[in-house]
Regions:
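Bacterial Sec-dependent N-terminal signal peptides
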Residues: 1-26
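Carbohydrate-active catalytic/glycan-binding domains of CAZyme proteins
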Residues: 23-413, 417-461
């Protein structure tokens, strides 16, 4: 409770001193959880962002990782992200279950994954720290994911963390991974077995006993664009930047080209994920900003960020400033408020958490007085007349519906009354001032002390 109070007080002071729009040019895109190791995938017009999860209770210090599951977020506009919760955890791998294996690293085992689609199946490559790299398979990107092998795909003896996958133009798939070495192997078309020998790349890693902060450390991200092969990576620790190399083939030889983002003392680690989406290129990574909004102590509680990426005519990449000094991405789409919008879809929030139950799936919880959520680029068209929300509570509260700022135009206030239980859901409706055009929407929560209600979804009519 003390930590929760500190978090709310600290964030409240920050927002009073600096309105949301000026908080920072490049804020973390997820605020309800600590997330890291972004693995974006584009599929049928949507971005699927697979992440690791740093637990809130991670202890102080740079070695205090607490990671037990993999999460999924989606977006169609690059600014509003929907939380789909846990899509896999260490229990998906029976060979990692401590009850079966006796393995003692379960509190810190679910490290950086990557998901890729092939022939209608989705393959989630997951490093189980200290045990190897496993692979899970599903029929759709939301899962459920299952382990087809019942054993690691790559054994623990090969620096087996941070997998990245590339399917080349000829259909040959490659799996890359490693720290401090870069390893790779060809995959068969089934994507769950290796074709040939595991190989250590001898050119890309740092030179022993030399201070060369731009070389490969970990977190490879392999991709091809406009005829060029790229290997992005977290550069020599610590702190880690995002470096990259280019080569003539999927296995190099790799030539160092520079930084995508230089190291910064504000962050110890890094992990790139790079995609093209709706005519633009993006790089994902992480910082520790949300952690330091709560405390001045270092905890391994990271937060994913994203920035637009630009290429030079020769294929090299323009260097970006550190996340805190960069430019926020612009929406590449709008949100339709007349369709059901899950409460866990947001661009920014204060004080909120997400949870899941069998009746409603994901929902927003931990709603207190003065908390809020923001949704960007909401297209009201010719105008809305009413606002409805599905909520559950044993107490009461209010939702202020505002435009473009925390104290922006007030469209209306929706009263939430006792529904008889925290998972007993009821729909509440209120009239709103007529509004049209594209705006940022703020749902600002008001009420007494303590938790007020849970929220499932909202929409305008």
């Amino acid at each position: 409770m003390k930590k929760l109070i500190l978090s709310r007080l600290t964030v409240a002071i920050l927002f009073i001193a600096s309105p949301l729009g000026h908080l920072n040019a490049q804020p973390p895109i997820i605020q309800t959880k600590f997330t890291a190791d972004p693995a974006p995938m584009v599929h049928k017009g949507m971005v699927y962002l697979y992440t690791t999860h740093d637990e809130d209770y991670a202890p102080e210090g740079m070695a205090g990782f607490r990671m037990k599951e993999w999460l999924l977020y989606t977006s169609t506009d690059m600014v509003n992200w929907t939380d789909h919760g846990t899509i896999a955890d260490l229990y998906n791998f029976k060979w990692a279950d401590p009850a079966v294996s006796g393995w003692g690293g379960f509190e810190n085992g679910a490290w950086a994954p990557q998901c890729i689609e092939r022939n209608g199946k989705f393959y989630l490559y997951c490093p189980v720290q200290g045990r190897g790299i496993g692979v899970l398979v599903a029929d759709n990107p939301f899962g459920p994911f299952t382990d087809p092998l019942g054993k690691p795909l790559i054994g623990a003896e090969y620096d087996s963390i941070d997998p990245s996958v590339l399917i080349d133009d000829d259909g040959q798939a490659y799996l890359y991974w490693g720290n401090p070495n870069l390893w790779y192997v060809k995959l068969n078309e089934d994507m769950i077995s290796c074709a040939g020998e595991i190989t250590k790349d001898k050119l890309i890693r740092k030179i022993e006993n030399q201070k060369d902060p731009y070389h490969f450390q970990e977190g490879p991200w392999a991709y091809k664009k406009n005829g060029h092969y790229y290997m992005a990576y977290a550069s020599t620790c610590c702190p880690e930047g995002i470096g990259y190399a280019m080569g003539p083939s999927s296995v190099g030889p790799w030539e160092f080209k520079g930084y995508i983002m230089k190291p910064n003392r504000k962050s110890s680690g890094n992990h790139p994920g790079i995609i093209d989406y709706k005519g633009k290129s993006y790089v994902f990574g992480f910082n520790y900003r949300l952690n330091f909004m709560i405390t001045d102590k270092h905890h391994e509680r990271r937060s994913i960020c994203v920035a637009e990426l630009e290429y030079n005519p020769d294929g090299t990449i323009k260097e970006l400033p550190w996340w805190d000094d960069g430019v926020a991405v612009e929406p590449v789409g709008t949100l339709n408020p007349y369709k059901r919008t899950e409460a866990e879809t947001m661009a920014w929030s204060q004080g909120l958490k997400t949870a899941k139950d069998d009746k409603s799936g994901m929902y927003v919880t931990s709603i207190h007085n003065r908390d809020f959520l923001q949704v960007k680029a909401v297209d009201f068209g010719k105008g809305a007349k009413t606002f409805e929300v599905r909520a559950a509570t044993i107490t009461k509260g209010k939702i202020e519906i505002r435009l473009d700022d925390l104290d922006g135009t007030l469209l209306g206030v929706c009263d939430i009354s006792n529904t008889g239980g925290w998972n007993t859901w009821k729909t509440f409706v209120t009239d709103v001032e007529k509004v049209g055009g594209v705006h940022d929407l703020y749902l600002v929560f008001r009420g007494g002390d303590g938790e007020m209600f849970n929220m499932d979804y909202w929409r305008f009519k």
